[in-house]
């Protein structure tokens, strides 16, 4: 009965030794002495700050990209037990003992190492030879700039990994489509394509370029599906294609509907990436829930949702603004800096520098710091008291109000006098009665921009409001201009008569709020310094927080001042630039982002050859001359769409960008060039070399060319790893181009 247990068990494993060897070599090249140098290298000073914020769960805002990339780096810190305590203030600073350098650099290094075997698999999936696939992988292996970038706590190698994973997954899916649609492997690779695309976008916005490429290729293939006569139209198969039990039958059926194919692609390539992208932000906001240094960039409502900071100040404030309320008003737009409506005792100059006159009324500005002069009292124009009645009478949309400055008791006013820096707009002031024929015009109509259908009550933090001047219909607006010294360089406030729509510069929200209880000015000033607390809960939804955070990231502009190592896209193709990443404090050992010039120039030549050959073939095919068999032509076109197209979409957009650019921005495009190189070489050997002798000569030239690339890689190795101190003479010998900045110490 149990005799079957005595039978031998045979396990068969199909191991691709080439793939194993490439993976091993990739790991060795990227992980070897990974902790060297044990010092901050170039942009590690930038990313390290955000890792520390994650470790301490402090909110931050970075406009360079979505949070997934930072979370990947922070995961390395978490796995290494990093507590976030390190001062990231200087390139070259030695890491303290509590910083797990190996762990922090591990994930980018693994991503760089795994890109080597992925290049091999991509070329195979394009149906080119193992020799061509091995060539692409070995070029990825020895390329100096890719090695340097992947051995540091930087994100380019992770971005490249997900770019290649997206392309590889789509090719796997596309090849499954030919023989086993709707199989488990078909679903797996299609889903992984969407996941990889989302991760690429989540690492850096540059990932959108490869995502668009994959979507474009998928759209072309979907268009071809529409012309497939073996597929039915939308019919009874729709229900079947959604049932797992039918999937095995569907791959053998010729009646699978087109709708099923299109729906599957839409879910995997559109819905899944969007859901994952939202998930990245959801996890990010869970991790960084404490108040931090970037709070003021966000709205009052967002700040109030963070632990500490404004949440601590505003906790328990009254929710509904009433007549007699004491409030601070923050401009929603917050450009050029977040600021609050402010006034002080000083008046506008009688005569401005350009000769124009003013009203000489009390200045009203927008002040970028919290101050007691930011407090205003919401007064009912029909009553004299400046306190909240019992019960409180809430202010509603459309109500007339007066805004009385808390410390000077003068009312917010505007009139037909030109603003100091914006003569097309009205001056805004606090009215001083000079006993002349200039009556006060201090009535404002409240408009709640984001009011709900169920309520029109003005609410603390939540309501975004506009103040429309009753007499002139001017809207209270932050112009963004800085006043001269007489205005203490504070921001100009104007009355905008030509305002159309609800621009953020005309929208305000109450940030701090209390119910005033004293009619005496001295007691009222004491109240303003110590606001009361009443428990009110305010929680923003995730989508509200996500929308604001995403908008701020896109709208925020870093200081794009010129950098010593910044460069233009034209300099990248021919490697006319480099970046000095690190210099040993005592020796001449140094790390540079410097590419393998043989590979870079050869990649550019391969692109040119591909373009010329494709143009030649298209012209010939137009004349009904087919130089290539149909299957070879389709391989050639698909390889060009993904490899040449990948280079184009990851390179050409930089010509349109107004930002500081560096050589490392070219690395994603370079990887697609490297994939194209062996494709072009094999095509020349297979289709342009007419005889065996020509093929042999061409193969010998390719071997010589690859040997030169290996020689260059080995020669530049001291600048790639930075583990060898070279003499000034040796360093000068490595300056192959006058534009290369090799650091030579002066003794």
Swiss-Prot record:
Q: In which tissues is it expressed?
A: Widely expressed. Highly expressed in testis, heart and pancreas. Detected at lower levels in kidney, skeletal muscle, brain, placenta, lung and liver.
User: Gene Ontology terms, cellular component aspect?
Assistant: acrosomal vesicle; dolichyl-phosphate-mannose-protein mannosyltransferase complex; endoplasmic reticulum; endoplasmic reticulum membrane; membrane; sarcoplasmic reticulum
Q: Which UniProt keywords apply?
A: Congenital muscular dystrophy, Disease variant, Dystroglycanopathy, Endoplasmic reticulum, Glycoprotein, Glycosyltransferase, Limb-girdle muscular dystrophy, Lissencephaly, Membrane, Metal-binding, Repeat, Transferase, Transmembrane, Transmembrane helix
The UniProt catalytic activity note for this protein reads: a di-trans,poly-cis-dolichyl beta-D-mannosyl phosphate + L-seryl-[protein] = 3-O-(alpha-D-mannosyl)-L-seryl-[protein] + a di-trans,poly-cis-dolichyl phosphate + H(+); a di-trans,poly-cis-dolichyl beta-D-mannosyl phosphate + L-threonyl-[protein] = 3-O-(alpha-D-mannosyl)-L-threonyl-[protein] + a di-trans,poly-cis-dolichyl phosphate + H(+)
Sugar attachment sites are 435, 471, 539
- Name the reported effect of residue 537 to R: In MDDGA1 and MDDGB1; likely benign
Question: A Pfam family for this UniProt protein?
Answer: MIR
Q: Which SMART domains match?
A: MIR
Q: How is its activity regulated?
A: Slightly activated by Mg(2+) and inhibited by both Ca(+) and Mn(2+). EDTA ha no effect on activity in vitro.
Top-level class of the enzyme under EC nomenclature: transferase
Membrane topology according to the record: Multi-pass membrane protein
Pathway per the UniProt entry = Protein modification; protein glycosylation
Q: What is its EC number?
A: 2.4.1.109
Tell me a GO biological process for this protein: protein O-linked glycosylation
Q: What is its main location?
A: endoplasmic reticulum
Where's the MIR domain? 318-381, 392-449, 453-513
Give the UniProt family note.
Belongs to the glycosyltransferase 39 family.
**Disease linkage in the record?**
Muscular dystrophy-dystroglycanopathy congenital with impaired intellectual development B1: An autosomal recessive disorder characterized by congenital muscular dystrophy associated with intellectual disability and mild structural brain abnormalities. Muscular dystrophy-dystroglycanopathy congenital with brain and eye anomalies A1: An autosomal recessive disorder characterized by congenital muscular dystrophy associated with cobblestone lissencephaly and other brain anomalies, eye malformations, profound intellectual disability, and death usually in the first years of life. Included diseases are the more severe Walker-Warburg syndrome and the slightly less severe muscle-eye-brain disease.
This protein's assembly is summarised as: Interacts with POMT2.
This chain belongs to the protein called Protein O-mannosyl-transferase 1
Provenance organism = Homo sapiens
Species lineage: Eukaryota, Metazoa, Chordata, Craniata, Vertebrata
**Gene name tied to this protein:** POMT1
